[in-house]
Every structure is written in structure tokens, then in C-alpha cells.
Amino acid sequence: MYEQAIVIRNDLKMGKGKMAAQACHASIQAFLHAQKISSSAVSGWMNEGQKKVVLKVNSEKELLEIFKNVNIEGLPCSLIRDAGRTQVEPGSLTAVGIGPEKEEKISKVTKDLKLL
């Protein structure tokens, strides 16, 4: 089974709409990266219904640690930096998108995170 994980910073106290927008940015950017490096995972994910899981971290440090580990594992990913026009400071790191990829590969990095 394939999935995509989106990790959101919970400490920024973004509104629901802002979090949804950041999650969408992370999802799309990670998907575009996956198309370049893992077309078979993208095809599998598309055929299985495009499962997504949204998780949370409580700091920029945690978000960057996840991003680092995702890169070490060689998974398609994205790191989202907000422009700061609304609720957060310019340049704030808000989210990481991971995959699509096989669930077991993603869970190696996300297994200790809680659902948003």
C-alpha cells in the first residue's frame, strides 16, 4: 500500500484554513518531486485512492529533523516556507510533505508522530 504523509507544525497556532493551505502546498510539492524520482510509487498511489495522513510536530527543530530523516531515506519530499502574508512570520517553516511512497518506507520516519 502507498500513502503520502504531511507533517504540520502545531506550535505556530495557525488557523484551520492556514493549516489546510500549508498541507496542500506540502502535498503538491512532494507529489511533483515523487513524479521525478519514483513514478511507480506515484502510479501505485494514484491507483489505490491517494491515501494521505496528516501528522504534527511541535517545533521547527522537530520539523527539520523529520525532513533530514526523509532525505536520508531517499524519499520524495518537500519543505514548505511560508511567505508570511497572513498568520505567521515571513520565512516560517510550516510543513513537510513525504511521498507518495510505500507506507512502510514512510512510517520508518513518521512512526512516532501523532495525528493532527
UniProtKB/Swiss-Prot annotation:
State if Kinase is listed as a keyword: no
Q: Where in the cell is it found?
A: Cytoplasm
Q: Name one GO molecular function term.
A: peptidyl-tRNA hydrolase activity
The record's principal subcellular location, in a coarse class, is cytoplasm
One BP term from GO: translation
Name the catalysed reactions. an N-acyl-L-alpha-aminoacyl-tRNA + H2O = an N-acyl-L-amino acid + a tRNA + H(+)
List where the protein spans the membrane: none
The UniProt record lists the EC number as 3.1.1.29
* Family label: Belongs to the PTH2 family.
Q: What does this protein do?
A: The natural substrate for this enzyme may be peptidyl-tRNAs which drop off the ribosome during protein synthesis.
Q: Which HAMAP family match?
A: Pept_tRNA_hydro_arch
This chain's protein is named Peptidyl-tRNA hydrolase
Which source organism? Methanococcus maripaludis (strain C7 / ATCC BAA-1331)
